[in-house]
């Protein structure tokens, strides 16, 4: 439902949901002025990830490492006011990012379609990172946490259909949730091919009233092969473009 999208994108509502579910997320804050952004960043500690609220494709997202960088970002990249807040989050150094696609029906059943491990480190936009399914380096205990949290978030948001959730795992194995997108994501075609199930078709059926049992999709598929997705980057067409990958999406496929 539309309210699920708002709950996932509105920082105050999202933080309240995660606290209610006892799910970890990186320390963060909401800033409606330059002064508030500086206070939030110094309370959290640099480096921080900054971005506008309600954004797609990582537009205007940046990792900043000092007050000077943050002031430059606010002056040149975004317009900050009470109606257009900026989100300030702790950047997790040396973390591994994971994408999870899951399917939910109206009866509250949730099945994970795939857990993808990013090859590039967390901080590179998920659309620019290569990834593998299944995960290759994440511990079973961290994966168990992801498998526990994913249905909790999907049910709490009231999702019927597909949901994408992004996680980060730091070197000691602690899992943090980065964001949830209560919709079909760009990874759905890749996961569907990897596991051999037409996820978009399944999502259409459950949105029309079918249950996961009706379509015989009731448990996570265990793969005996590895599938890899690589991004298509257009730097040969744009020779002047900065080739350093970051939180703002660069790939075209």
Language-model features and meaning:
Residues 1-61:
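A conserved helix-loop-beta module that forms one wall/lid of the active-site cleft
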């Amino acid at each position: 439902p539309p309210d699920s999208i708002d709950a996932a994108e509105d920082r105050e509502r999202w933080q309240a949901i995660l606290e209610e579910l006892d799910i970890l997320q990186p320390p963060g804050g909401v800033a409606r002025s330059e002064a508030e952004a500086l206070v939030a960043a110094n309370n959290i500690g640099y480096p921080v990830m900054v971005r506008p609220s309600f954004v797609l494709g990582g537009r205007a997202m940046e990792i900043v490492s000092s007050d000077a960088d943050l002031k430059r970002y606010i002056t040149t990249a975004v317009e900050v006011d009470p109606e257009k807040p900026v989100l300030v989050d702790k950047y997790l150094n040396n973390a591994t990012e994971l994408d999870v696609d899951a399917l939910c029906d109206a009866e509250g059943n949730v099945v994970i379609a795939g857990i993808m491990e990013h090859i590039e480190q967390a901080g590179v936009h998920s659309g620019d990172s290569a990834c593998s399914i299944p995960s290759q380096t994440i511990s079973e205990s961290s994966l168990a946490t992801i498998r526990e949290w994913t249905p909790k978030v999907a049910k709490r948001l009231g999702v019927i259909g597909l949901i994408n959730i992004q996680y980060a795992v730091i070197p000691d194995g602690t899992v943090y949730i980065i964001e949830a997108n209560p919709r079909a994501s760009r990874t759905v075609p890749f996961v569907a091919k990897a596991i051999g199930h037409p996820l978009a078709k399944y999502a259409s059926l459950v949105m029309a009233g079918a249950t996961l049992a009706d379509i015989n999709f009731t448990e996570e598929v265990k793969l005996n092969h590895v599938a890899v997705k690589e991004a298509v980057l257009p730097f040969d067409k744009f020779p002047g473009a900065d080739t350093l990958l970051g939180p703002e999406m660069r790939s075209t496929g």
